């Protein structure tokens, strides 16, 4: 992957963290790299099972039982925003999925506190229990397939799958997908 990224024109900076490290040391490293680079660092790719920051007090999918902190890798991408863990108290009827309380390690913000400076992505095959392969083997398989795609060793079918069930509660949500998918794969290659 490193050579593929360099071949694509990226400058790669790498740091290895123990998977039990919480989100703050990883973010501090990202901030340090960003500042040392003179803002040349533009993207962050997290590979492996590292801390997933949780933040906020909302339910983006409209399910009230999920109100609380949601996964927020954007925490890593916001270099200078003020993220706090002191005010949100979630009353979500005992749901174990998304609790958020003051000083619990989950951030308060439901809205990103400042414009993000970085793109962020994650390749994490942890808890993929539906597969017989280990986390390491699944990651290796993904990276090998990624390499094959970049070098045109495979040519996957161009198609998209569109689920419109949220249109009932949030009108026109699928319109964005239609507008995005059609130019990428063509109208006839979209499956509902």
Q: What are the functions of these language-model segments?
A:
Residues 1-192:
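Cysteine-dependent hydrolase recognition
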């Amino acid at each position: 992957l490193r050579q593929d990224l360099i071949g694509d024109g990226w400058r790669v900076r790498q740091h290895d963290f123990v998977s039990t490290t919480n989100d703050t040391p990883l973010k501090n490293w990202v901030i340090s790299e960003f500042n040392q680079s003179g803002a040349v660092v533009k993207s962050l790719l997290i590979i492996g099972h590292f801390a997933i920051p949780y933040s906020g007090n909302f339910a983006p999918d409209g399910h009230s039982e999920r109100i609380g902190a949601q996964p927020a890798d954007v925490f890593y991408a916001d270099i200078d925003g003020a993220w706090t863990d002191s005010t949100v108290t979630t009353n979500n009827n005992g749901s174990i999925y998304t609790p958020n309380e003051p000083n619990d390690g989950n951030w308060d913000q439901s809205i990103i506190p400042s414009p993000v400076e970085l793109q962020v992505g994650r390749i994490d095959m942890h808890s993929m229990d539906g597969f017989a392969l280990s986390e390491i083997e699944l990651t290796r398989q993904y990276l090998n397939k990624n390499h094959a795609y970049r070098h045109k060793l495979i040519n996957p079918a161009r198609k998209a799958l569109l689920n419109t069930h949220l249109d009932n509660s949030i009108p026109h949500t699928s319109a964005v997908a239609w507008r995005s998918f059609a130019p990428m794969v063509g109208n006839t290659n979209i499956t509902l």
